[in-house]
UniProtKB/Swiss-Prot annotation:
It comes from Xenopus tropicalis (Western clawed frog). Possible splicing regulator involved in the control of cellular survival. The keyword Cytoplasm does not apply. This is Protein SREK1IP1. GO terms for molecular function: nucleic acid binding; zinc ion binding. Residues 75-93, 104-137 have a biased composition (Basic residues). Residues 58-74, 94-103 have a biased composition (Basic and acidic residues).
Length: 155
């Protein structure tokens, strides 16, 4: 059978770096790498008393200050580059917008011209003229239908 002392309930998962349960190895914050050339230094501040916390904070701040100075310089350079890129993009974008606006204006003016021409061709017809045209159509259609009926009867 199975060994009585070993099962999933009895095995506690813990950190392989510091040995404390409650977090996994990749989540371990008890080790700090002060210098990349040196070995890993154990940071016991999370497990020690309140008196030693002040000392460990001061030690931790010193390397962090050096990093902050270099980080701020890098950040400033990045910001400058980003601003330049944004300005360049705006210039390109704004010029294309003005082209689009001019094209849109041309289209609108062409549409207006077409409307004006269409109206001029169509012109205004007065009611009397329309009535005359209708009468002429009716008379021409009735005469043509009567002539067609006469021709069919004569056959």
């Amino acid at each position: 059978m199975a060994v009585p002392g070993v099962n999933k309930d009895n095995i506690r998962a813990g950190c392989k770096k510091c040995g404390y349960p409650g977090h996994l190895t990749f989540e371990c914050r008890n080790f700090l790498r002060v210098d990349p050339q040196r070995d890993i230094v154990l940071d016991v501040s999370s497990t020690s008393t309140e008196d030693s916390e002040d000392e460990s904070e001061e030690v931790a701040r010193a390397p962090a200050d050096k990093k902050n100075v270099t980080d701020t310089g890098k950040k400033k350079l990045k910001r400058k580059k980003e601003k330049k890129l944004k300005k360049h993009r705006k210039r390109l974008h704004s010029s294309s917008e003005s082209d689009d606006n001019s094209k849109a204006k041309k289209r609108k003016s062409q549409k207006k011209e077409k409307r004006v021409k269409h109206k001029a061709k169509k012109g205004k017809q007065h009611k009397k003229d329309k009535r005359k045209e209708k009468r002429e159509r009716k008379s021409s259609s009735s005469s043509s239908s009567s002539s067609s009926s006469q021709s069919s009867s004569s056959d």
